[in-house]
């Protein structure tokens, strides 16, 4: 009930200012992870405002990918994200923001700051640092109850190929702060995501995505499996 009230409040915030808001976007995505033999679905609603604010809410559902003691995550989760764009000039933008993640395990907060550079009209770069702090404790490798907090660095490249296609690459490095390990048996892990969007109409954009997720696969009690993610989705301007 408490979570529902929070999400209702965020939705009200996102859609209560039509005079200054841009078009909202609905993103529907499905995916499959080869190492974990897992399926995912995601629904995401986002909206930006002309005064610099941006907000989103998304819901993720998995099958049994996390049905393993070595994987500290939940099968279903909801997250809310808010950021504010500060224009430094015509090319550079700083975006401080906050991501709040709700799951059956508890709540995670992810304050971040992102720096974006519009090199040209068609080519854009970005870097972001985020600190994921968990409001709940989990057993660490020493058997103690601690917080599995994470430092996260992201890099972004977006290239507008032509009026029909856009290509994007996101690279991510995770580093655990305390005595925990990823499924690759290390304190750090990497991810690389490659996305190709097709602008079918001004309001409808289907896309495909391939991610290499390091050796983070978990399946039937085994971990350290090579993990590939294949996704397909479509976004709609509402």
Curated annotation (Swiss-Prot):
Organism: Escherichia coli O6:H1 (strain CFT073 / ATCC 700928 / UPEC)
Alphabetized Pfam families for the sequence: KdgM
The family this protein is said to belong to: Belongs to the oligogalacturonate-specific porin KdgM (TC 1.B.35) family. NanC subfamily.
Role according to the record: Outer membrane channel protein allowing the entry of N-acetylneuraminic acid (Neu5Ac, the most abundant sialic acid on host cell surfaces) into the bacteria. NanC proteins form high-conductance channels which are open at low membrane potentials and which have a weak anion selectivity.
Subcellular location, record wording: Cell outer membrane
Transmembrane segments: 26-32, 40-49, 53-61, 77-86, 92-102, 108-117, 123-132, 152-159, 165-173, 191-200, 204-212, 229-236
Catalysed reaction, written as an equation: N-acetylneuraminate(in) = N-acetylneuraminate(out)
Protein name as catalogued: N-acetylneuraminic acid outer membrane channel protein NanC
Chief subcellular location: membrane
Lineage of producing organism: Bacteria, Pseudomonadati, Pseudomonadota, Gammaproteobacteria, Enterobacterales
Keywords from the named record: Cell outer membrane, Ion transport, Membrane, Porin, Signal, Sugar transport, Transmembrane, Transmembrane beta strand, Transport
Periplasmic compartment residues: 24-25, 50-52, 87-91, 118-122, 160-164, 201-203, 237-238
Extracellular-facing ranges: 33-39, 62-76, 103-107, 133-151, 174-190, 213-228
A molecular-function term among this protein's GO annotations: porin activity
Any one GO CC term of the record: pore complex
